[in-house]
From Swiss-Prot:
Annotated protein name in UniProt: Large ribosomal subunit protein bL33
Pfam families membership: Ribosomal_L33
Signal peptide: none
Record organism: Finegoldia magna (strain ATCC 29328 / DSM 20472 / WAL 2508) (Peptostreptococcus magnus)
Gene: rpmG
PROSITE patterns: RIBOSOMAL_L33
Amino acid sequence: MRDKVILECTECKSRNYTTKKNKKLHPDRVETNKYCKFCKKHTLHKETR
């Protein structure tokens, strides 16, 4: 089953992106480099719980 996860910017703490993942196959947290429109640069975004 795929669950909705929210990605949060590590610098400004704004929650910019939502995505889906299969938590049974990938139990670890998602970390990706994405563009933050508030910081106006690419930053690391982590999954929130």
